[in-house]
């Protein structure tokens, strides 16, 4: 499955929640997509369908392809801790996600573009791999020549989210990935245990 680049609201309506963040269009049309969306009832789904839907929601939320997501699950399974929680922690430690959380980009899709276009450094070195995994203590910054980019400045000026596991200095346009977030510090509405059950079948 290729990375989805179509209308975000359509996908959000499929899951019944704004999985990509604030979405005014979703708020106006909070029902399944399609010609008979308003008439459709979210009927009872099979256990497999519920588990699959949760996995798809996580993949769309973080913008991760199936192969990458499966690899993250395998890594989480081999790591000490609760597998589902570790899986989400690995997703949160991706560079594109941290760039999004820091407010450098308004969405993870935008964060991937910023990283891919070489606007971000990690510990002083340019990193253009969105899936790059950060370690506690890593410093993430906007590249010097990119600090005046309108898209970045606009995103930072509109950002109001504060997370305990990252710091951000808006004057220097740099921050630190302080620690791996605990599950309670991850705001995503994902039932990770359903994903674990699906992959363990």
Swiss-Prot record:
Q: Does the keyword Kinase apply?
A: no
Q: Which UniProt keywords apply?
A: Ribonucleoprotein, Ribosomal protein, RNA-binding, rRNA-binding
Paired cysteines (S-S): none
Q: Does the keyword Cell membrane apply?
A: no
Which parts of the sequence belong to the S4 RNA-binding domain? Answer: 93-153
Report the InterPro entries cross-referenced here. Answer: Ribosomal_uS4 (IPR022801), Ribosomal_uS4_bac-type (IPR005709), Ribosomal_uS4_N (IPR001912), S4_RNA-bd (IPR002942), S4_RNA-bd_sf (IPR036986)
The GO terms describing molecular function are: rRNA binding; structural constituent of ribosome
Extract the Pfam families matched here: Ribosomal_S4, S4
Q: What SMART domains would the database entry show?
A: Ribosomal_S4 (SM01390), S4 (SM00363)
- Can you cite a GO biological process for this protein? translation
The family classification in the record reads:
Belongs to the universal ribosomal protein uS4 family.
Q: How does it assemble?
A: Part of the 30S ribosomal subunit. Contacts protein S5. The interaction surface between S4 and S5 is involved in control of translational fidelity.
Looking up HAMAP family in the UniProt record yields: Ribosomal_uS4_B
Functionally, this protein is described as follows:
One of the primary rRNA binding proteins, it binds directly to 16S rRNA where it nucleates assembly of the body of the 30S subunit. With S5 and S12 plays an important role in translational accuracy.
Name this protein carries in UniProt: Small ribosomal subunit protein uS4
Please tell me the species this chain comes from: Flavobacterium johnsoniae (strain ATCC 17061 / DSM 2064 / JCM 8514 / BCRC 14874 / CCUG 350202 / NBRC 14942 / NCIMB 11054 / UW101)
């Amino acid at each position: 499955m290729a990375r989805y680049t179509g209308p975000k609201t359509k996908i959000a309506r499929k899951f019944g929640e704004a999985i990509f963040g604030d979405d005014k269009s979703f708020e106006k049309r909070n029902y399944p997509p399609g010609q008979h969306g308003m008439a459709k009832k979210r009927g009872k789904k099979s256990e497999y369908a519920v588990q699959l839907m949760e996995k798809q929601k996580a993949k769309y939320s973080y913008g991760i392809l199936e192969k990458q997501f499966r690899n993250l699950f395998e890594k989480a399974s081999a790591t000490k801790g609760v597998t589902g929680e570790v899986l989400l922690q690995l997703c949160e430690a991706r560079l594109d996600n941290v760039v999004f959380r820091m407010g450098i980009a308004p969405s993870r899709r935008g964060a991937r573009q910023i990283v891919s276009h070489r606007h971000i450094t990690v510990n002083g070195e340019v990193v253009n791999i969105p899936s790059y995994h950060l370690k506690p203590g890593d410093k993430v910054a906007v590249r010097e020549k990119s600090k005046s980019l309108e898209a970045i400045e606009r995103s930072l000026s509109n950002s109001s989210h504060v997370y305990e596991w990252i710091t951000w200095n808006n004057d220097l346009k740099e921050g630190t990935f302080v620690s791996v977030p605990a599950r309670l510090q991850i705001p995503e509405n994902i039932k990770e245990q359903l994903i674990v059950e699906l992959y363990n079948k």
